[in-house]
Amino acid sequence: MPIFTAQELAERFNLQLFGDGNIRIHGVATLAQASPEQLSFLANPRYLTQLLNSRAGVIVLHADDVKAASGTVLIAKDPYVTFAKIATLFDIKPAREAGIHPLATVDPSAHVSPTAHVGAFVSIGARSSIGASCIIGTGSIIGDDCTIDDGSELIARVTLISRVRLGKRVRIHPGAVLGGEGFGLAMESGHWIKIPQLGGVVIGDDCEIGANSCIDRGALDDTVLEEDVHIDNLVQIAHNCRIGAHTAIAGCTGIAGSAKIGRYCLLGGHVGVVGHLQICDNVVITGKSVVRNSIHTPGEYSSGTPLTDNRTWRKNAVRFKQLDMLVRRMMAVSKEKA
């Protein structure tokens, strides 16, 4: 594990140091759990009490909070972002030896860079290409006509079914499936006819896709994630969707086919997005919301019923069913008075 002094961290990240610059930091932790050899941070005033009782050797915080700290501190404009950058210094991953594991299966027409790592029980299909310094983790399946650009990582048991293109430095977590058939059906004489899904999936540079998430290939056009999109676990992105750059989508969200999500959007957990609509740039959708119409104005949007005690909720539910009747009565009374 690397060790840094407070002074070294201040210089590396251009931070203002107050206190002992010679304190040696071995890792990072929360305010409540940090030891004198660890660094922590304060980004939310609600944790000021924890700051007062923290044993952390160094604390990253905003200039407005420096008077509340008694030990060594690093002043940052955005303590949360700064902490994230410092934490990466301690996130040391074991090196993977380049080469193809003897228990992997690679089609003769596929290309694997000599600097890539291909783990055990990996299968790579026809005409697929693995770029330089890629890591293809144990049990991953790469189908035909897939391309993985330099520096990307499939952690383990990732499936790229067919016609999937990954950009540079893409990271995909276990259980994710990309390039599955989109849910396309046409009804004829009381029976469903399956519509062939002839498109692909395109993932931009620096994207991350969480465990057990699914991104379906397009029917005709590709399903696209632009650069620096971050997808949490258990997210479903249907065929022909397009997700704009720098957008983040939290777990259990479902996006129906052909929806277009703008840049710098944030979708909370368990959001539902109806198909064939558009969400403009810089939109925040709070958790459990359902987006039924296109959004053309940036801002924060919510839907659903807030949590309350069960007794109150049941009363409100009964009154909700009576709203139409009550409105009609009010309109009738207004007409009588007029």
UniProtKB/Swiss-Prot annotation:
Organism: Xylella fastidiosa (strain M12)
Catalytic activity: a UDP-3-O-[(3R)-3-hydroxyacyl]-alpha-D-glucosamine + a (3R)-hydroxyacyl-[ACP] = a UDP-2-N,3-O-bis[(3R)-3-hydroxyacyl]-alpha-D-glucosamine + holo-[ACP] + H(+)
CDD domains referenced in this protein's UniProt entry, alphabetically: LbH_LpxD (cd03352)
A GO cellular component annotation in the UniProt record: membrane
Keyword Transport: no
InterPro entries: Hexapep, LpxD, Trimer_LpxA-like_sf, UDP_GlcNAc_AcTrfase_non-rep
Name the record gives this protein: UDP-3-O-acylglucosamine N-acyltransferase
Keyword Transferase in record: yes
Function: Catalyzes the N-acylation of UDP-3-O-acylglucosamine using 3-hydroxyacyl-ACP as the acyl donor. Is involved in the biosynthesis of lipid A, a phosphorylated glycolipid that anchors the lipopolysaccharide to the outer membrane of the cell.
Family the entry assigns: Belongs to the transferase hexapeptide repeat family. LpxD subfamily.
Single GO molecular function: N-acyltransferase activity
NCBIfam families: lipid_A_lpxD (TIGR01853), PRK00892.1 (NF002060)
Top-level EC class: transferase
EC number(s) stated in the UniProt entry for this protein: 2.3.1.191
Pathway in which the depicted protein is active: Bacterial outer membrane biogenesis; LPS lipid A biosynthesis
UniProtKB keywords: Acyltransferase, Lipid A biosynthesis, Lipid biosynthesis, Lipid metabolism, Repeat, Transferase
Subunit structure, interactors included: Homotrimer.
SUPFAM superfamilies, per the entry: Trimeric LpxA-like enzymes (SSF51161)
Annotated active site: 239 (proton acceptor)
